[in-house]
Curated annotation (Swiss-Prot):
InterPro entries: EF-hand-dom_pair (IPR011992), EF_Hand_1_Ca_BS (IPR018247), EF_hand_dom (IPR002048), EFHC1/EFHC2/EFHB (IPR040193)
Identification of the protein by name: EF-hand domain-containing family member B
UniProt subcellular location: Cytoplasm, Cytoskeleton, Cilium axoneme; Cytoplasm, Cytoskeleton, Flagellum axoneme; Cytoplasm
Alphabetic keyword roster: Calcium, Calcium transport, Cell projection, Cilium, Cytoplasm, Cytoskeleton, Flagellum, Ion transport, Metal-binding, Repeat, Transport
GO molecular function: calcium ion binding; calcium ion sensor activity
Domain EF-hand: 605-640, 641-676
Amino acid sequence: MCSFLRVPSPKGLEPSKGLGAPLQPGTAYPSEMSALGPGMTVSGRKSPLSMEVGLAPEGKDDLEERRVFMGTTSPTELGLRVGLRKDFPCSKTYEERMASPEIRSPSSKGLELRLKRQNISRTVMDGSNLGVHRVSASQETKPPLSALPGRVGLEKERFLAGYCPGRVTQPPLGQGCESPQASGGRRCPVTGDPEGFGASVSKLPALGMECRGELGGESACVVMKPRAETEPPVEVDMGLTRLEEPAEMESPEPQMGLVMEPPAWQLAQQPEEQREAENTEPGVEPPDRIRPIYSGKFFDRMPCWPSAGKVLPIGYRAATCLTERFPRLMTPPEAKKFFNFRYPPAGAERVFYGRANDPQIAPSLTHGIRSKISIPAKVLINPQPITTFQQKMKDKKESVYFSNQRAPLGKSHDQTPGLPKGLDILNTTFGTAIVRETSARDMVNPPKPYKEVFEEAQAGHDLYVVSHNDYFVGEAKNRKYDPSSFHRFNLYGIPTPHFNDGRNMAKTLHWLHELQMKRGAKIVSKRVDDFKEKFQHRLGRVLDPIAETMNVPPDYTFGAFLRPEDYGVGDLIHRRLPGEYLRGKDRQRGLVAAVRHHLKKVNYQNFDTLLAAFRHYDKKGDGVIDRAELQEACDQACLHLDEKLLDQLFEYCDVDKDGLINYLEFANFLTWKDKTPLKEYEERVLIKGRKADCANPAEANVEESEPALLLKPEDIVLKEPGSSEKTLRTLLRPSDKVSNHYKTTSSEISAVVGAVPSTCYPTYGVPTIRSDIPAPLIRRVSDRTSYGEEGNAYSLLHPTIFAQKGVFERDFFKTRSKQEISEILCNIGVKLSEDEFENVWNLASKKHHRGEVCVENIRSVLDELQHADGAKCKAAT
């Protein structure tokens, strides 16, 4: 068991007489103190942490081995203490080196002086064969990682301080540099004044035999009270409980301790370090200042051991690296104007460097005449309301004006002064009463049919033409020329070029340069054109990427050539003859249709009746139109047809193939007969062949009819069933008639008597509308199956009245009570007595096996009752 005591240095103790040699200052570890025998002597003095211990040779050797094992002695020290003697060459070399004045430091010189004085005292007191070993108490310095620049010098001084017979010991690794006894209880450093050291040597006390007996019973390490020293710069917590001590260590009671206080000369800052600290930047710690790695909940038990990894300086952080060390250089004002001219700042005006330093007069100049501030528009548009008194005063001021008296704003002027006295101004009306026969609405849109309005407009038109020159739009003026030499429908002069395809209008819609660009040659890159032809689709053409590799014409078709038939499906259905086939004649039929459409439009716009149009075509007046007359009429209508197209048109209109176009054929193929109904007098002329009635003004302009009949009575039919208007019957070509033996393939299926009906044929696949399975009450979001309860396209285009009102199928089939059904019938206007309603309810409840009634059942019952009542009425009649 090792115990540690700290006792103050007694001043009245005498040196021990039993010692064979003078005790020298030194320290010992607990393990070393326990190895000492009863012959150990400890001497304390005021030198820092000094102890004198007397050891036997055996104990001395044991202590040497313990020192080597514990690692408390440096290799150089071990060589000097154990293996090296005075006659050893290395020892002599080291002594010569240390004796040179260049290597010696002030502290080493002081130590050398002390050692000389101690040697003098040793020779005086040396009188026995007891081996004495001196233990030095020099401590290691604070920085454990050899990071401080003054470490080499300190180790030299430490070595010199212990280069007397004895050795330099260090505290165990992990031991802190500050102990609870070190705060406030330190003295002067060992490297102090040599005179003070001499005084301390003369006052060396000696411990008596009582102390030896105590040491023999239980080894103890007695630590003498050191002088006051400067505190180390950094504290390292050892994790042990610290004992609080007063500021002055004068208590005679011994205290326990595990830490040896280092001397102040080891902790004192060197002048080089002070200069380096002064050169560091403010707010940044120097790189050589090492802090403990662990400063949180864990303790660094071995602060002297180097830590793993790279220890970065604490002061250098990202903010320090990103902060500019030196301020930016400022551009001189003389050069700034040139820089601003070439690279103006964002949002700044580019100013020429020649006038950059000119006085700024333009911003303060104001051009024009300064106008006076008038009333703002806000006050004029929305003035502040005035009081009633102010309004009265304003009206009184304006009442003197004549305009205010005769035409006041918003009301009529006072007419009382100009009226006779006693006149009832409220009930008296001046002027003649207006008879309101017809309203403006009836004048603009009279409540009459179109036919009646048209007849009223035509009545008296011939008289208005003579009296007022009132002609209809597009009506030709009748100049009463001699019809024998002049016909009013003939055309004279040079014909104006006209095209119905709108090419002239297309020219007016484009600028001249656009038309010239269209006529100009379009230059396209051959590479682009080849790429488009090979890879891009074209309208109406099949994409053929390898067309350029084929040495064939563009319209070439590979494979066996199949000659198409002359007839098509339509020719087979209508059973046309070989000369009447329509296949391959689409262009020809299109041209004929275009000519017919143009003639129909001319006849409708220029003639009021079909008879007048037919008379225009019938130049000879024989009641038929031949080929020459048709060509003349086409020329008058600006249709210059070639011989082939004219023959096709004439052949199309001549249904009976007699070489002439009669009135019925003309009305069917060259006019819109449905838009020009047959008039009564026109019917008499066509059927009876009589002359026109001169008393009727509508028939006065009609030329004398031919005695031959133009139509048969059966050719005139009603325009619509039940209508009074009449029109001509529609002609059908023999080729348009469908054969009576024509039957479809679907009609021939199952035509055999006794065959299996088509409903019994097996069906394959899943039906589109799944009416075979019931629809779920709650459908999933992902369920897109049609169960037949949803509406189709017809229901969307033509919704029922129920859908328009928001009533759906589930509302019809929902079970309802008797009171609810009664309210629904009353709301829709169906009034039933109580007996009738009970009868309807009973019939509807019988339709369901559980007696439930819905709106659909009530509706079906009402329909059945109504149908039964109608059948009874028919039977009674």
